[in-house]
Design a protein with these regions (language model features):
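Rieske [2Fe-2S] iron-sulfur-binding domain
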Residues: 21-110
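Zn-dependent metallo-beta-lactamase
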Residues: 1-26
Length: 110
């Protein structure tokens, strides 16, 4: 599920390390930002749907075939970074936020 939010500059693109996640607070929402080796940036809910803990930014970034993924650090379910859908159990879904990079700045929201 993609959620619309007011556009907010979160950080500089260079502050995101490839294949690592970082947490950010936008209003009262915790989000997890991920930058992949090919330079794509993804924004998802930081809340693990299984445990309820705000830990997704500490997940293991990788891929399954051509699908960029993050594995929950709690129970290791693997989520598609593009859609938020769990590849192991499609009933589990992370909220996806619109994200873009403009002038070297990572902007979350519309």
């Amino acid at each position: 599920m993609t959620v619309s939010t007011t556009a907010v500059v979160v950080c500089g693109f260079d502050a995101l390390l490839p294949e690592r996640g970082v947490a950010a607070l936008i209003g009262d929402r915790q989000i997890a930002l991920f930058r992949t080796y090919d330079g794509q940036v993804f924004a998802l809910s930081n809340t693990d749907p299984v445990s309820g803990a705000n830990v997704m930014s500490r997940g293991i970034v990788g891929n399954r075939g051509d699908v960029p993924t993050v594995a929950s650090p709690m129970f290791k379910q693997v989520y598609d970074l593009r859609t938020g859908v769990c590849l192991d159990d499609p009933s589990l879904v992370l909220t996806v936020y619109p994200v873009r990079v403009t002038d070297g700045q990572v902007i979350v929201g519309d």
